[in-house]
Swiss-Prot record:
UniProt keyword list: Oxidoreductase, PQQ biosynthesis
Disulfide bonds: none
Catalytic activity as recorded in UniProt: 6-(2-amino-2-carboxyethyl)-7,8-dioxo-1,2,3,4,7,8-hexahydroquinoline-2,4-dicarboxylate + 3 O2 = pyrroloquinoline quinone + 2 H2O2 + 2 H2O + H(+)
Pfam families: TENA_THI-4
Gene Ontology molecular functions: pyrroloquinoline-quinone synthase activity
Top-level class of the enzyme under EC nomenclature: oxidoreductase
Protein name: Pyrroloquinoline-quinone synthase
The family this protein is said to belong to: Belongs to the PqqC family.
Biochemical pathway: Cofactor biosynthesis; pyrroloquinoline quinone biosynthesis
EC number: 1.3.3.11
SUPFAM superfamilies: Heme oxygenase-like
Length: 52
């Protein structure tokens, strides 16, 4: 039931940065729909469905 002691060791700067970058890949700004919207590639109907 006790966590291993290694769980209490702080991440290195590089590990911390990598964990943040890995987490960021899941953000909505990278979703294909959002990318198409940002690039102006959505049809009027697609954009209206998103707004509704």
């Amino acid at each position: 039931m006790n966590a291993p002691l290694t769980d209490n060791i702080p991440w290195t700067r590089e590990e911390f940065e990598q964990k943040l970058r890995d987490k960021g890949r899941g953000y909505h700004i990278y979703h294909p729909f959002h990318v198409m919207m940002y690039e102006g590639k959505l049809t009027r109907e697609q954009l209206q469905c998103w707004v509704a």
